[in-house]
Design a protein with these regions (language model features):
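A Zn2+-metalloprotease active-site environment signal
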Residues: 2-19, 24, 37-298
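Sec-dependent signal peptide hydrophobic core
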Residues: 28-33
Length: 298
């Protein structure tokens, strides 16, 4: 079978031009997408910006400290139970606090990658103390005094919890113990050089984590990180302002031991207000997502 010769040179040229144009458009589009991706801030770049946790903390084994915290926490629970001060699981305020924690804990690993593996726990102790704490490893306790005296809203209670959790996430206790060890070791070496007596083992962790006093910089750090945590959990971070105003007023009526190492109330409020522009968009996005999830369940 014979085929007639057909001249396709013109058609081939036009086809080549169209292909080249399409390729250029695709290449340009890909370049624009790549540029947009490179210029887009990563997901972790929103919210507050804090420096790295103190490197001194590495002098203290995290696992050992967290195990010590578990032991001390269990002792606190047993003592409170014997005195009738450990409120039951079905108590309205216990249920409330655990619901708040259930929203904050899932976002905690933003500031500490090990937080997801911690055995988190929340208890409420019947006591007039205006206080709360979170031990290394996620062991949380509130005193009824802080809830009742300050009449905390859910957002304000979340701010207290976020602040205390931030101490654990940023490993402030671990760093404080490390600093104490270095001081003790230095004193021991100096005592040895001067012919002094014996000194206790500088590598011993010590027995009372609740007696540790955080520095003012630790407290400010915990405020800022706590602000970020509650915003991601869809709690209003502006509650940080109202909370510390309540704390300041309560301190005027009767000086609070809780605030003895904390920054002054006015400075604290100013620092929180300064960081609100960084966390309000995070809060609004989290709130919208939470409301959307609630609507989808109906």
């Amino acid at each position: 079978m014979r085929f007639s010769h057909i001249n396709l040179s013109g058609q081939n040229s036009a086809l080549a031009q169209r292909c080249a144009a399409k390729c250029w458009i695709k290449t340009a589009g890909a370049a624009i997408c790549l540029l947009s991706f490179l210029l887009m801030p990563p997901a972790w770049a929103d919210g507050v910006s804090v420096g790295k946790a103190s490197r001194l903390r590495n002098l203290v084994p995290a696992a050992e400290l967290e195990q010590s915290a578990v032991v001390e926490y269990e002792q606190i629970k047993k003592q409170a139970e014997l005195k009738g001060e450990l409120l039951p699981d079905n108590h309205a305020q216990v249920v409330r606090l655990r619901a708040i924690a259930a929203r904050i804990i899932p976002v905690a690993d933003r500031f500490n990658s090990r937080a997801g593996g911690w055995p988190w726990e929340v208890i409420l102790l019947k006591s007039p103390q205006i206080n709360a704490f979170c031990m290394p490893g996620g062991k949380i306790a509130f005193y009824t005094g802080i809830l009742d005296t300050l009449k905390l809203t859910d957002d304000e209670a979340a701010m207290v919890m976020g602040h205390e959790i931030a101490h654990a996430l940023r490993e402030h206790a671990r760093a404080r113990i490390a600093k104490g060890q270095l001081t003790q070791l230095g004193a021991g070496i100096l005592g040895g050089l001067l012919g002094g007596g014996h000194y206790t083992d500088a590598l011993q962790l010590g027995g009372n984590l609740l007696s540790l006093k955080f520095s003012r910089s630790d407290e400010t750090d915990a405020d800022i990180v706590g602000l970020d945590l509650i915003a991601r959990a869809a709690f209003d971070p502006r509650a940080g302002v109202t909370l510390w105003k309540k704390m300041t007023e309560a301190n005027k009526r009767s000086p609070l031991e809780l605030l003895s190492t904390h920054p002054a109330g006015e400075n604290r409020v100013k620092e929180i207000e300064k960081n609100l522009p960084q966390v309000m968009p995070v809060y609004q996005a989290a709130l919208k997502a939470r409301q959307g999830a609630a609507m989808s369940k109906r």
